[in-house]
Curated annotation (Swiss-Prot):
Name the UniProt record assigns to this protein: Basic phospholipase A2 Drk-b2
Any one GO molecular-function label of the UniProt entry: calcium-dependent phospholipase A2 activity
Comment on bound cofactor: Binds 1 Ca(2+) ion.
Positions with a binding annotation for Ca(2+): Y43, G45, G47, D64
One cellular-component annotation, GO: extracellular region
Organism: Daboia russelii
Keyword presence, Membrane: no
Top-rank lineage group of the source organism: Eukaryota
Catalytic activity: a 1,2-diacyl-sn-glycero-3-phosphocholine + H2O = a 1-acyl-sn-glycero-3-phosphocholine + a fatty acid + H(+)
Tissue specificity annotation: Expressed by the venom gland.
SUPFAM superfamilies recorded: Phospholipase A2, PLA2 (SSF48619)
Keyword Transport (UniProt): no
EC numbers: 3.1.1.4
Amino acid sequence: MRTLWIVAVCLIGVEGNLLQFGRMIFRMTAKNPLSSYSNYGCYCGWGGKGKPQDATDRCCFVHDCCYEKVNDCNPKTATYSYSFENGGIVCGDRDPCKRAVCECDRVAATCFRDNLNTYDKKYRKYPPSQCTGTEQC
């Protein structure tokens, strides 16, 4: 399974912190990040439009908004340092940009964990045509 995740990351495109974010998600939720969160609702995955469909989709919406606020580096390629401590994630990078990216990912992974009870498989592979309305960051 681990090999499949690494191969999938390579096929999607090499993105520095994508693997780090995936590890955070797995550690916090015990779910496969690729199959469970890469194409969920209107905001989990690349792009996003419309209104978030549930609490998990809102986690992705907030994550997208967080990335939009990151300055001085590309949040999709910036690698950062972090650790797992006492059931949580601790961002440890001193570089302000990398730390901001880590915080975006930490908050999202924690949000996924906190909303596991409302995760709904019907939002996997959700059709973009169903994503209507607008939501502001």
